[in-house]
Amino acid sequence: MANLKSSKKDIRRTARRKERNGEDRTELRTYARLLIKAIKSGDKTEALTVFSKLSSKLDRAAKTKLIHKKNADRKKSRMALRINSIEAKAA
């Protein structure tokens, strides 16, 4: 147990950050799951809508250093390839 006032504050701050980061990570996984579901169903308009939201969430997560910027870019790139594969299958 921390004795210093600043150490106790650090513990509280860390707990708040951990909770917020966990919520944000969960949100990222949820949007990724929704996008994959839309891609598998072949619904391009839904996939593009969800991709836009996911892209925004990934950029925000990278900005707040929840994930690395290159990790966010890689995930967006791979999801874009999957969305483009919908067109290829339809054609």
UniProtKB/Swiss-Prot annotation:
GO-annotated molecular function: small ribosomal subunit rRNA binding; structural constituent of ribosome
Alphabetically ordered keywords of this record: Ribonucleoprotein, Ribosomal protein, RNA-binding, rRNA-binding
GO cellular component: cytosol; small ribosomal subunit
Entries under InterPro entries matching the protein: Ribosomal_bS20, Ribosomal_bS20_sf
Tree of life domain: Bacteria
Keyword set includes Flavoprotein: no
GO terms of biological process kind: translation
Disordered, as annotated region: 1-26
Pfam families noted in UniProt: Ribosomal_S20p
HAMAP family: Ribosomal_bS20
Similarity comment text for this entry: Belongs to the bacterial ribosomal protein bS20 family.
Function: Binds directly to 16S ribosomal RNA.
Protein name per the record: Small ribosomal subunit protein bS20
Source organism phylogeny: Bacteria, Pseudomonadati, Spirochaetota, Spirochaetia, Leptospirales
Gene that specifies this protein: rpsT
